[in-house]
Amino acid sequence: MQKTIISVKNLQKSYGTFEAVKGISFDVYEGEIFGLLGPNGAGKSTTLEIIETLRDKTSGEVMVDGMNLDNEPDNIKKIIGVQLQSSGFYPGLTLLELIRLFAGLYNRPVQPMELLKLVNLEDKAKSKYKELSGGQKQRFSIATTLINQPKIVFLDEPTTGLDPQARRNLWDLIKDIRSKGATVIITTHYMDEAEQLCDRIAILDEGKIIALASPDKLIDDLVATGFERPKQVKAANLEDVFINLTGKEIREE
């Protein structure tokens, strides 16, 4: 039986009369990639920020690795890695300097070059953050989530704004992080991303979970209703063409 590492029960978040999250419940299993999928405004990021201890909930219960969010937020922070957005980094510092800075905040020894190697940025170690491309910035931000050797990694829309090759490289990185033992939770509004990455997804709309299962199960259930696509699925799509023409792994992000 899979161990539940995050349990959310009847989570609700209101801003005045507006309900951003409407009493949702779900579990995340240890070692899986779990996705919160939905359009903008569905409540994905709000839910993630509550679990990360970054935003107060209105009501409900959140347990993280056996710890109650209400009683042990500081202990929860010690076992999670949260992806920072670009505004969270000093643009004039090098990647080595930034890693050492964040390691100092965690009061934890770290091997900066090992972290950079994990995200294929060792050749950028002495580059300033502002000199990185969009894909490189995203990979570096994920590297910083791993400084405290977290049990759970949270990634909020990790591939937004990236080109197709950079997105696929980031997918490989996320799978690699999971293969090393971490549980990963992502939010996304990309259907292909959820299908490729996630073991299970919760589909949110207007603050409610309207479906929760593996991508394959959700697709099979839809097909079982008699649903058919209006045109035949081809062996490749336009994104595959783009990546093939631009050189795959040779292309600089």
Predicted regions and their residues:
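Conserved catalytic motifs of ABC-family nucleotide-binding domains
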Residues: 149
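ABC ATPase "signature
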Residues: 212-213
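Conserved ABC transporter NBD signature motif
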Residues: 60-68, 75-76
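Conserved ABC ATPase "signature" region
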Residues: 100, 104, 109-124
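Catalytic Walker B motif of ABC-type/P-loop ATPase nucleotide-binding domains
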Residues: 153-157
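Conserved ABC ATPase signature
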Residues: 128-132
